[in-house]
């Protein structure tokens, strides 16, 4: 329970208490309607001063913010800075001030139970009330585990001085399920920020928060079903993992901590974790490139973010060989729709087979039903780089096309500011062009998309562009839709191609902030 001071609200004798089953509205100034408020919240203004971050708020801190120009209110465990909302509150500023610096949950429920406050005040969210968990009985002697929290003495303090606030977690249960809740203290957490693996009643859940990784790693105290669900409440930065019990017994505790449990460290310092994925299909795309489909285990939740890669691992002549590959969609045409919320259990890869190579021939020899080890996502591409971009240019050579697939998908389905996206695709011959037919169908389907091919060893019949990446080719290709339109460029291919391309882009006066080079 929250021990936060409560206030009488509405005040005795106030219009809101006198009115039967409701409240009297207070006349608002011009331009202070609910629609005006929603417009203001979409303006991008920072209403909390936390720049999108979330904090844990103590009772003492909450009490300090009790003035009209600095008013925090706690509703159902979450703290909001309602100062910007004062002039927009239909019940008037004075009534809102009754809960200033206090827990307004009961007051809110009495008058506003029907209101979707999470949506209306989401831009005012400061964070979550700090709650001191109760200590239940130990699961096993000598392993003291709190109700979803390890004692501070057992937690490695790996949080650097700079970086996001350390997350926390808790858990609760019903007769048939156990729910683990991770409080990330950051807004805009997505399903692809969460990776969950359940194996032999060992739970491993990783939340990627900016450039850090928070890990829950527990040997569960009881058996659970292999299927589970993951839910993300983006605007409050909350992750819920719901496990189904095998037996309807009451758990005294969640379980025992395993390696690196409750750790929060820079992502670059975490090791790769692999799970076994089954080969479901493989089909020819070109004379030397295949489309591989791998199925995740039913006890895994993993979605690869746009433009990021994973590592595939095989045992070759007694040695483990690891190679990075960027997942793609099954097809350029079928995937251009809103994604479903349920996790996708299949991962697709476009992989060129090198007959003299060590890894790809072994991969190509796998039979349907065989297994490949797949790591979690890696990479530094962030879709936030594409925010408000109007002209997107993609430069790809060979299988450097693969990261462009998800970038292209995201651009055409989620970027409302986009005027055009152009792909310049470098290959040796026409036979090497991956998904050429699909690219041309997509260009017909969506007029914002345009593709140009450049061949280094074309046939005599080829009428298109030829050669290698050059200043002349790029200066002609990189034409903005408007003189001052916001642009972004992605480039991927063999290292010499990428390095030369970035050098040429700099020569053409594009800045580092406008360029992303994909490297593994």
From Swiss-Prot:
Keyword Endoplasmic reticulum tagged: yes
Binding site for heme: 89, 112
Pfam family for this entry, one: FAD_binding_6
SUPFAM superfamilies named in the record: Cytochrome b5-like heme/steroid binding domain, Ferredoxin reductase-like, C-terminal NADP-linked domain, HSP20-like chaperones, Riboflavin synthase domain-like
An example molecular function term from Gene Ontology annotations: NADPH-hemoprotein reductase activity
Alphabetically ordered keywords of this record: Acetylation, Endoplasmic reticulum, FAD, Flavoprotein, Heme, Iron, Metal-binding, NAD, Oxidoreductase
Domain CS as annotated: residue spans: 164-255
Keyword Acyltransferase among record annotations: no
Top-level division of the source organism's lineage: Eukaryota
GO-annotated cellular components: cytoplasm; endoplasmic reticulum; perinuclear region of cytoplasm
Enzyme class (EC, first level): oxidoreductase
Enzyme Commission numbers on file: 1.6.2.2
CDD domains reported in the protein's UniProt record: cyt_b5_reduct_like, p23_NCB5OR
Biological processes, Gene Ontology terms: cell development; glucose homeostasis; insulin secretion; NADP metabolic process; reactive oxygen species metabolic process; response to antibiotic; superoxide metabolic process
Organs and tissues of expression: Isoform 2 is expressed in testis, brain, skeletal muscle and in the male germline.
Ranges of Polar residues composition bias in the record: 13-23
Family: Belongs to the flavoprotein pyridine nucleotide cytochrome reductase family.
PANTHER family for this protein: CYTOCHROME B5 REDUCTASE 4, CYTOCHROME B5 REDUCTASE 4 FAMILY MEMBER
Role, per record: NADH-cytochrome b5 reductase involved in endoplasmic reticulum stress response pathway. Plays a critical role in protecting pancreatic beta-cells against oxidant stress, possibly by protecting the cell from excess buildup of reactive oxygen species (ROS).
Name recorded for this polypeptide: Cytochrome b5 reductase 4
Species of origin: Rattus norvegicus (Rat)
Gene name as annotated: Cyb5r4
């Amino acid at each position: 329970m929250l021990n936060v001071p409560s206030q009488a609200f509405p005040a005795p004798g106030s219009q809101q208490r006198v009115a039967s089953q409701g409240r009297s509205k207070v006349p608002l100034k011009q331009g202070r309607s609910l629609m005006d408020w929603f417009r203001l919240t979409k303006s991008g203004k920072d209403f909390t001063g936390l720049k999108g971050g979330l904090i844990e708020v103590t009772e003492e801190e909450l009490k300090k913010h009790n003035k009209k120009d600095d008013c925090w209110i706690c509703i159902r465990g979450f703290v909001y800075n309602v100062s910007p909302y004062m002039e927009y509150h239909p019940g008037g500023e004075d009534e809102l001030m009754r809960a200033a610096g206090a827990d307004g949950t009961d007051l809110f429920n009495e008058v506003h139970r029907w209101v979707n406050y999470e949506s209306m005040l989401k831009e005012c969210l400061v964070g979550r009330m700090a709650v001191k968990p109760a200590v239940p009985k130990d699961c096993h002697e000598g392993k003291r585990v709190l109700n979803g929290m390890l004692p501070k003495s057992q937690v490695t303090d790996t949080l650097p001085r700079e970086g996001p606030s350390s997350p926390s977690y808790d858990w609760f249960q019903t007769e048939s399920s156990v729910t683990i809740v991770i409080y990330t203290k950051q807004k805009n957490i997505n399903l692809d920020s969460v990776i969950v693996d359940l194996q032999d009643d060992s739970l491993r859940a990783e939340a990627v928060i900016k450039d850090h990784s928070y890990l829950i790693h527990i040997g569960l105290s009881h058996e659970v079903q292999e299927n589970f669900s993951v839910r993300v409440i983006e605007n409050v930065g909350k992750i819920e993992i719901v496990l189904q019990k095998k037996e309807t017994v009451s758990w005294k505790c969640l379980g025992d901590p395993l390696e690196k449990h409750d750790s929060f460290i820079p992502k670059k310092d975490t090791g790769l974790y692999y799970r076994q994925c089954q080969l479901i299909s493989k089909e020819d795309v070109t004379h030397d490139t295949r489309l591989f489909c791998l199925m995740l285990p039913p006890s895994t939740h993993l979605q690869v973010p746009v433009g990021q890669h994973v590592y595939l691992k095989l045992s070759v002549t007694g040695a483990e060989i690891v190679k990075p590959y960027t997942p793609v969609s099954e097809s350029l045409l079928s995937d251009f729709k809103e994604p479903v919320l349920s996790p996708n259990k299949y991962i697709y890869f476009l992989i060129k087979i090198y007959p003299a190579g060590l890894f790809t021939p072994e991969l190509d020899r796998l039979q349907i039903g065989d297994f490949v080890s797949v790591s979690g996502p890696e990479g530094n591409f962030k879709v936030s780089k594409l925010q408000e971009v109007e002209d997107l240019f993609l430069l790809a050579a060979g299988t450097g096309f693969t990261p462009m697939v998800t970038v292209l998908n995201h651009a055409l389905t989620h970027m409302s500011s986009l005027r055009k996206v152009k792909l310049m695709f470098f290959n040796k011959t026409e036979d090497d062009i991956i998904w050429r037919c699909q690219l041309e169908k997509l260009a017909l389907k969506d007029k914002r998309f345009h593709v140009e091919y450049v061949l280094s060893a074309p046939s005599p019949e080829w009428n298109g562009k030829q050669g290698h990446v050059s200043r002349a080719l790029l200066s002609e290709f990189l034409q903005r839709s408007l003189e001052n339109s916001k642009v972004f460029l992605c480039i991927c291919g063999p290292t010499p191609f990428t390095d030369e391309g970035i050098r040429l882009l700099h020569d053409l006066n594009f800045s580092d902030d406008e360029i992303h080079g994909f490297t593994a």
